[in-house]
């Protein structure tokens, strides 16, 4: 029992995070130097994301009986994303207005370091809904894979899958090759995941060593408020959706606990993407649904980021005494409904989208971003964790709506009853 515990990835990552926190706290300079370990692990994961998405989507679509089913899955997924993302935005807006973490700070925007956020503001100006949509189309297929742009790879994979499906029996050889290649890729993922504890240790040691636990105190109320809001969203909103769909959110969280710990250590939900594709399929969701919903959700279903954006924007208004009436807040909500969809496609995602939103709304001081800059790194864990759980729940929900969910397998796996390799008929 003890041997299996020590060998489990869950235990190893949790231990690594704890050691990283201790090193960063007691030896901050040494902790800050551990950054390359975390960066290297995230780069290894990003290296494999594009081929994983390509193989999963192509084999999923090409193996389907009807192309109408693919279109239906995509439409249902986008509808779900829009509804739940809107709920997340409203959830953050309500709680930040009730708690008012920025009230009483009385910060003069003129005293803030505008230069500290100048780079983010400049990047934000380059972002827009048209630019985001145009960026989905790659300049070249090789460029899409080289840059690791999830949506570009997804677009090419969908088109490739459609074309391969139309070939019928003539395309069977290509299908078999891609499926075999997919098995090799997942073998590589298993090897990379053995390094997860080292990556989590390096990233956590760097965060605590560079920013220090003390930097949390001044703006701690916002951080605590944000974390509680994310927990409430997962338990109440996603929990209700899960219950209606037929499973327990707590059992689901236990099922993906290793992926959650990897995300906690690296602060990047992308670091768990390859494993989530595999795990959601093992949970009973058909491969074609998993291949469409998970990658698309990384740009269109960022629940944690949505909560962060509304809370951070209103916090800046409260801290700088910038009045926001109901009209201003509705305007903020509408702008965020559009701008939040590009969050995963931008380097520094959440913070840059926040800068773009504040610039677009107009009546909030852009310099107020400096208040958030110092603590943004500590809020990224809650964002990433909520995003991951949200995308996992979305996959199960969409799979059920389009009748591509194996309910018996879902129940068996979440209750630890299904032996490896056991399959069931897909229910309708």
From Swiss-Prot:
Keywords, sorted A to Z: Cell inner membrane, Cell membrane, Membrane, Symport, Transmembrane, Transmembrane helix, Transport
One Pfam family from the record: SDF
Compartment annotation: Cell inner membrane
Any one of the GO CC terms: plasma membrane
Cited NCBIfam families: PRK01663.1, PRK13027.1
Protein task: Responsible for the transport of dicarboxylates such as succinate, fumarate, and malate from the periplasm across the membrane.
Entry's family note: Belongs to the dicarboxylate/amino acid:cation symporter (DAACS) (TC 2.A.23) family.
UniProt name for this protein: Aerobic C4-dicarboxylate transport protein
């Amino acid at each position: 029992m003890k041997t299996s515990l020590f060998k489990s990835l869950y235990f190893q990552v949790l231990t690594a995070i704890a050691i990283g926190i201790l090193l960063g706290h007691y030896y901050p300079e040494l902790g800050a130097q551990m950054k390359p370990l975390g960066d290297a692990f995230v780069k290894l994961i990003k290296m494999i994301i594009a081929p994983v998405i390509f193989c999963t989507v192509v084999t999923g679509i090409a193996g389907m009986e009807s192309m109408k089913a693919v279109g239906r899955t995509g439409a249902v997924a986008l509808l779900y994303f829009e509804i739940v993302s809107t709920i997340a935005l409203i959830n953050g807006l309500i709680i930040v207005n009730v708690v008012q973490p920025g009230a009483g700070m009385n910060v003069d925007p003129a005293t803030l370091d505008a230069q500290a956020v100048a780079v983010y503001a400049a990047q934000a100006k380059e972002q827009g809904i048209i630019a985001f949509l145009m960026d989905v189309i790659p300049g070249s297929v090789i460029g899409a894979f080289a840059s690791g742009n999830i949506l570009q790879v997804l677009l090419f994979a969908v088109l490739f899958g459609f074309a391969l499906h139309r070939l019928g029996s003539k395309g069977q050889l290509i299908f078999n090759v891609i499926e075999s290649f997919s098995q090799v890729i997942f073998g590589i993922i298993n090897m990379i995941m053995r390094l997860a504890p080292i990556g989590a240790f390096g990233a956590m040691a760097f965060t605590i060593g560079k920013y220090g636990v003390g930097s949390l105190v001044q703006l701690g109320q916002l951080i605590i408020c944000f974390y509680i809001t994310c927990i409430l969203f997962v338990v109440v909103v996603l929990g209700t959706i899960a219950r209606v769909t037929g499973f327990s959110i707590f059992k689901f969280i236990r099922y993906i606990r290793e992926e959650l710990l990897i995300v906690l250590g690296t602060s990047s939900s992308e670091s768990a993407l390859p494993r989530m594709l595999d795990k959601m399929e093992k949970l009973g969701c058909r491969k074609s649904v998993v291949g469409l919903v998970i990658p698309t959700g990384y740009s269109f279903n960022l629940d944690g980021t949505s909560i962060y954006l509304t809370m951070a924007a209103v916090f800046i208004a409260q801290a700088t005494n910038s009045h926001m009436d109901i009209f201003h807040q509705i305007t903020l909500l509408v702008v965020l409904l559009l701008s939040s969809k590009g969050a995963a496609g931008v380097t520094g995602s959440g913070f840059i989208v926040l800068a773009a939103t504040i610039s677009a709304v107009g009546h909030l001081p852009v310099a107020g971003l400096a208040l958030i800059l110092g603590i943004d790194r500590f809020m990224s864990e809650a964002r990433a964790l909520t995003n991951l759980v949200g995308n996992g729940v979305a996959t199960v929900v969409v799979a059920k709506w389009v009748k591509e969910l194996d309910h018996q397998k879902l129940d068996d796996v979440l209750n630890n009853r299904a032996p490896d390799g056991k399959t069931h008929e897909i229910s309708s």
